[in-house]
UniProtKB/Swiss-Prot annotation:
Localization: Membrane
Species annotation: Homo sapiens (Human)
Keyword Transmembrane helix: yes
Membrane topology: Multi-pass membrane protein
Gene it is expressed from: MROH7
First and last residues of every HEAT repeat: 957-995, 1036-1074, 1079-1117, 1125-1162
Protein name: Maestro heat-like repeat-containing protein family member 7
């Protein structure tokens, strides 16, 4: 059909028109000449419709027409035999038709005719016969040859097709009521308006109805058109009769036609823009059927407000047609639209678009019920060349009529612009006028965002309806119909995204494949056995057609993969009928791809290995039919690959011949020994298998080993396992070298699949690639295994053991060397990223240690493994690694799994290594001493390592010498953690006799260097090493010479390290020449220990106080000034610490204080050595303070500073006793107290009055009052001091004024201050 640009045809329908008597004839108006088509014509692509989101399925009407070759389907003449003698009526529609497909029209001739089957000529016009008549009267203004209606039908039966009718042949099963498949025979209702550049406005009535036996036809020519008036006679049953009384002339250039009001009550006129306007005011019929050809711009504006019926044809000759108005667009295969053409549809109840090529087997329909209220129309999607869309977004609220969209074959339209016309109706003077406004044209660059949303919404609704269908029966055709609709929607724009497409495929596949077997469904409902079988095959066919359409929609590797992934799980089902459906569908998709190969050739074949592997696996399926079909799919796949290869080489090949050749080459199927077919296929596909394909083949083979709750019998499982084993072994034997770059992916796939394989024999087959690949690519396999998730579960552990237990086993020596190399790596890279490689290597080593055959090789590198593991323990302290998850829950219900701590896992491997090497005593020793826990803490790791080394020395481990010589070079390597661990182990080995063989520079020299190390731990370890060396007589003097450096290195060190070092140094102080030791060393050691008296850790306080006393015992006369000053500065810390309430610490304090008093000859009050609390012994505290100030007056301010410092201690007991001590100490210092010191005390007490501990607050207030009273009594408080003013305004406790001395009561400023103080407290 060729349409010229600029033409416009508009239809207005009057909703107030009343029905007329039924007519049985179809008059025609037409000229015999068909003008030349427009020169700018092009072949157009297929037209598709885009639905609105409100569309729903329409029930089946169960009325159809049978296509008969050589005859018109729909209206049948007397000579047309019908099984039921029923007559079907064409729908009330507007039909736009063009010349017949495959026929050449003589556009220059005046008379157009066709030879019928009997040699007669048929006119181009199309008379219509109703079932009650054998002829239709025709009025024509042209010179067409006369022929009867039967001739006309025969002339056009095989050349013009019509969609919108239905098949009523009882021998043909019913398909989707929304998709009507027709033969190439068709019926054209009416003549042709064939003016290429004409525009017409037709306005049929809205509520009119024609009898079912009528089919009025309007035919308008484009050449010599004469005036003719038509009327409907009351008794003519719808026959149009010329009427010259009321005519309105329509003229456009050389066009002049008129129609009387009796026929349509319409007025025809043309404007300068060649737009014909026809106004309707009379009675008409709703069965109006008009056919238009070669009109380039068509606008339809009926005013219908009635409900819509999907199909207007029916079996019953006297039934009533429900739709008041509808439009049918009929196109032939060779018709075109010009680039500037457009179609405008407005307020049309039903829109049917139809087209077919000559060689098409089926017809396609687009039937769209349109909403009567155009204000709800939001937009229309334009046709996009190459994608074939024509969209009609239509609002369809709940309760409205439904819409069905069908595909139109390619070549129906070319670039056509769709427009939306909003037409509100307005009535004036009894005449109905249509006003066209708000016309929106959507071009190819139209925004498709809203259209995309509408399509997705429609698809989701259909998917939801599919999901609502029962999965245990097939009782309706809803699935089939829905998938057919989805097939048509796949041709519309925009295309679905990958996620939406995958979801759609999964839903449809699950809905069909989950159905029981056909036999089971038939047994459940025996009465409908045949219906169920037919419906099942139709449903499966609809699914396969949908998958093919989706494949065409997205012919990319990702698009095909989305289909194959949905089918994959079903191919491994334990149910034979589900596997058969999946294999059959796979083969169907492959066959479709083979037919459309040239279109997909540039993309190659995606997911080849996955699909090939699944099909190969099912060659060995217990069901022989499945195996045979799988082999047929492989043959098709091989043909596709060869065609692509030859296409790249630009070789022409016959598909059919190549397929038959491959079928003979790869077949036949051998049900007795399917493994022969498997080996043959794998061998021949070698040229097409790359690394990714090899990986997919292996993983597909593993899928066949999965267990199933409904798995087949034992023999069937064995057959599938055998097929998998043959497939795995043959692929790895022939193509192992190609899998090198995908070994990590293969190992990961095996690890994941093992979780689903439970049978022992199947697990052995699944682990086969591990040993086969490791025999050739050991390093790559080990690296891949190191990536397994941690902690290792049974699957990962079994993969590690597979390297050694199964043949061909790998070289254990090489394997251990690889693991040792991984253990020497840091778990944190230079970029700061955590790595699981060392921890994974430790886990792999732990699994290998369980294999007895490895022990000899392990012992060879035992020292290296032990030291590497100990260093890894240090590295993993406090480290959180990626991919580490908690192990599965315990068997006990409700038991919470312990969190996975990497350092504990490494410690476990150390234990395992020691036990396997026979060090059970050492392991037990560490358990008893808490060495493993020490090893896991960052501050005590070196102690745990040292404890292990000490145990190995104590129990004379045979490997100590090798470890000793290995450690010497390690002391200078690595980072701080590396050196600390190595040094901690090395220091304990200095007790061995073999150390004498080591040069002194590697023992004493290295330890001496460690004293100046910046890390305190290294200093402590060096002291430990020197103390051990000092046990040897030849090195004692050298070590004691280093004693001042050792003591000096303890300054500003953590208390625990100080305690550890001093405990080691005690051994040095013992000896014959201890009296000759310089006292300055002891004093310096005392200075180091004193600050740790107030350490928060009890063990540190207790140890330091105890060590302090022992050092004092080592002091000898004469007492030096440094000694006296140091011991005097110890008095207050010991007195205050004694009151903290800890009996153990208090006891150590008393003992140390006695030692100090003995050495210094102090005469302290006896109560000073008492551990009783000071709460009710204020006089005792005052007596102690008075003794201290009187005895050590020069150190009084030191005592005050120390007590103020303890007032800041974190322990409340120390803060309280320090406040009490200050309250007694300050009055004793009245003669030497300065204003600055007093202000310092005042500030400290003010802060303590807000202490969180209530007792501290109370004692702080009491002490403040006591100090104030003492100052007044002794008159040493300076005038104008802020102490009084501040206390008067803030003090919360009122001192007793009556107890003040009389001399002070006369001082006005003091009494004034006290008065204001009282007032403030009362407030």
């Amino acid at each position: 059909m060729a349409l010229s640009p600029g033409a416009n045809l508009v239809f207005h329908e009057d909703p107030k028109m009343t029905p007329s008597p039924p007519s049985c004839g179809a008059p025609g108006l037409g000229s015999g000449t068909i003008p030349q088509p427009h020169p700018d014509m092009a072949q157009v692509p297929m037209l598709n419709l885009l639905p609105s989101p409100g569309l729903a399925l329409v029930p089946d009407l169960n009325d159809s027409l049978s296509p008969v070759s050589g005859e018109a389907s729909g209206l049948v003449s007397e000579n047309t035999p019908r099984p039921d003698d029923s007559r079907a009526i064409a729908p009330a529609s507007l039909q736009i038709t063009s010349s017949c497909s495959g026929e050449a029209l003589d556009l220059d001739s005046k008379d157009v005719s066709r030879p019928d089957s009997q040699g007669r000529l048929c006119p181009a016009s199309n008379p219509i016969l109703s079932p009650s008549s054998t002829e239709a009267p025709r009025l024509s203004s042209g010179n067409h040859p006369q022929s009867n209606s039967e001739d006309a039908f025969k002339c056009l039966s095989s050349k013009i097709f019509k969609l919108g009718q239905r098949n009523s042949n009882p021998s043909r099963h019913e398909l989707n009521p929304f998709i009507r498949h027709h033969s190439r025979e068709g019926l054209v209702l009416g003549h042709c308006i064939s003016r290429p550049s004409s525009k017409a406005l037709l306005i049929p009535t809205s509520n009119s109805s024609l009898d079912l036996d009528s089919n009025p036809l309007l035919n308008m020519g484009s050449r010599n058109t004469s005036k003719l008036n038509l009327n409907v006679a009351p008794d003519s049953h719808g026959t149009l009769i010329p009427d010259t009384n009321e005519t309105i002339t329509l003229a456009s250039h050389n066009i002049s036609e008129s129609v009387s009001k009796g026929a349509f009550s319409t007025t025809w006129s043309t404007s300068s823009k060649e737009t014909m306007n026809v106004a309707s005011s009379g009675h008409s019929r709703s069965d109006l059927s008009v056919t238009i050809t070669q009109a380039s711009y068509v606008t339809l504006i009926p005013g219908s407000s009635y409900g819509i019926s999907l199909h207007s044809s029916t079996h019953e000759p006297n039934s009533t047609i429900s739709p008041p108005s509808c439009m049918t667009l009929i196109l032939g295969s060779n018709e075109t639209l010009s680039l500037d053409s457009s179609l405008l549809f407005s307020d049309t109840s039903t829109l049917t678009l139809s087209s077919q090529q000559d060689d098409a087997k089926d017809n396609s329909i687009h039937t769209v019920p349109l909403e009567e209220n155009l204000e709800s129309w939001s937009e229309m999607a334009s046709i996009k060349v190459g994608q074939f869309p024509l969209g009609f977004p239509i609002s369809n609220p709940a309760g409205k009529d439904a819409v069905t969209l069908q595909g139109i074959p390619e070549g129906a339209f070319d670039e056509v612009t769709s427009c939306l016309v909003k037409v509100p109706e307005k009535t004036e003077g009894g005449n109905n006028m249509a006003l066209v406004e708000n016309v929106t044209t959507l071009q190819k660059s139209q925004d498709l965002l809203e259209a995309e949303g509408e399509k997705k919404t429609m698809i989701k609704k259909i998917m939801r309806q599919i999901q609502e269908e029962p999965l245990d029966s097939l009782s309706s055709s809803v699935r089939k119909q829905a998938m057919e609709i989805l097939t048509q929607l796949s041709h519309t724009q925009p295309t679905l995204g990958m996620r939406e497409r995958s979801e759609l495929v999964n839903v449809c596949v699950h809905s069909v494949f989950s159905l029981p077997s056909v036999q089971a469904m038939q047994e459940k409902d025996e009465a409908k056995a045949e219906t169920i079988q037919a419906l099942y095959h139709q449903t499966l066919e609809a699914l396969q057609t949908l998958l093919k359409a989706l494949f065409i929609e997205d012919p990319t590797p990702a698009g095909l993969k989305s289909i194959l992934e949905a089918l994959g799980p079903w191919m491994n089902s334990g149910k034979a009928h589900e596997r058969a459906r999946a294999v059959n569908t796979n083969v169907s998709v492959l066959n479709h791809m083979l037919l459309t190969l040239p279109f997909f050739m540039p993309l190659g074949f995606p997911a080849l290995g996955l699909l090939l592997g699944r099909l190969i696996l099912h060659i060995g399926d217990p069901d022989e039919e499945i195996g045979c079909e799988a082999l047929d799919g492989i043959i098709i796949l091989y043909t596709i690959l060869e065609l692509q290869k030859r296409a790249r080489d630009k070789e022409e090949t016959n598909k059919k011949e190549l397929y038959e050749s491959n079928k003979h080459f790869l077949g036949p199927y051998n049900p007795v020994s399917p493994c022969q077919n498997i080996l043959r296929v794998i061998e021949e596909f070698g040229d097409f298998l790359g690394p990714q394909q090899i990986k997919d083949l292996l993983l597909a083979a593993l899928e066949g080993l999965k267990g199933s709750s409904e798995a087949p019998g034992k023999d069937s499982r064995e057959m599938m396992q055998l097929a998998s084993e043959v497939m795995l072994s043959s692929v790895l034997e022939w193509y192992r070298h190609r899998a090198l770059e995908v070994i990590p992916e293969i190992m990961q796939g095996i690890y994941m699949q093992l979780s689903h394989i439970q049978e022992p024999r199947a697990r052995q087959v699944a682990l086969l690639p591990v040993s086969l690949l490791a025999s050739s690519f050991m390093t790559e396999v080990v690296v891949a295994l190191l990536m397994c998730p941690l902690p290792l579960n049974s699957n990962g552990a079994e993969m590690w053991r597979q390297l050694i237990l199964c043949k061909p086993s790998c070289d254990v020596r090489d394997l251990l060397d690889l693991l040792l190399g991984s253990l020497k790596e840091k778990p944190v890279t230079k970029e700061g990223r955590a790595s699981i490689v060392p921890l994974a290597a430790a886990s792999g080593l732990c699994e290998l240690l369980s294999v007895n055959s490895c022990m000899g090789r392990v012992r060879r590198i035992y020292p290296q493994l032990l030291l590497a593991l100990l260093i890894q323990v240090h590295y993993h302290i406090g480290l959180n690694l990626p991919g580490c998850v908690a192990p599965p829950k315990d068997t006990k219900k409700g038991a919470q799994p312990s969190p996975f701590v990497p350092v504990r896992w490494v410690v476990k491997v150390v234990k395992t290594l020691l036990l396997r090497m026979g060090c059970s005593y050492e392991t037990t020793f560490l358990e008893d001493q808490g060495g493993w826990e020490l090893m896991e803490q960052v501050e005590s790791h070196h102690r745990g390592v040292a404890l292990l080394a000490r145990a190995m020395v104590q129990y004379s481990c045979q490997e100590l010498c090798r470890i000793l010589y290995l450690l010497i070079p390690l002391l200078e390597r690595g980072d701080e953690k590396h050196r600390i661990t190595a040094t901690a182990f090395f220091v304990e080995l200095l007790q061995m006799e073999q150390v004498r063989r080591i040069p002194e520079e590697y023992s004493l020299g290295r330890m001496a260097e460690g004293l100046s190390h910046h890390d305190p731990i290294m200093k402590v370890l060096s002291i430990r090493g020197l103390v051990i060396l000092a046990r040897r007589s030849e090195k004692t003097a050298k070590v004691k010479a280093l004693l001042p450096s050792m003591v000096k290195g303890l300054k500003n060190m953590d208390g625990m390290l100080v305690v550890e070092a001093v405990h080691n140094l005690k051994a040095v102080f013992k000896g014959r020449d201890q009296k000759l030791m310089d006292s300055a060393v002891y004093v310096e050691m005392l200075q180091i220990l004193l600050p740790h008296f107030s350490d928060a850790r009890e063990v540190v306080r207790s140890s330091c106080i105890n060590l302090y006393g022992k050092v004092v015992q080592k002091l000898r006369a004469p007492r030096t000034q440094a000694m006296e000053e140091q011991l005097v500065s110890t008095l207050v810390p010991l007195l205050l610490t004694m009151q903290e309430g800890n009996s153990k610490v208090s006891q150590k304090c008393v003992k140390t204080l006695l030692r100090c008093s003995y050495f210094m000859a102090w005469e302290l009050p006896k109560r000073a050595y008492s551990r009783k609390p000071w709460d009710n012994q204020q006089q005792t505290v005052a007596k102690i303070c008075k003794c201290l100030v009187n005895t050590h007056r020069d150190s009084a301010f030191i005592f005050l500073s120390q007590s103020l410092e303890y007032a800041k201690n974190s322990r409340a007991s120390l803060r309280k006793c320090s406040v009490m001590f200050i309250g007694s100490l300050v009055p004793c210092m009245e003669s030497i107290m300065t204003e600055d010191r007093l202000n310092e005390v005042k500030a400290a007490l003010d802060n303590l009055r807000h202490d969180p501990e209530a007792s501290v607050c109370i004692y702080a207030a009491q002490v403040q009052d006591h100090i104030l009273a003492s100052c007044w009594q002794n008159s040493w408080l300076p005038h104008g001091n802020s102490w009084v003013c501040y206390s008067a305004t803030t003090h919360r406790w009122s001192p007793s004024c009556e107890n003040l001395p009389t001399s002070h009561q006369r001082r006005s400023w003091i009494m004034q201050a006290l008065g204001s103080w009282k007032m403030s407290l009362k407030k």
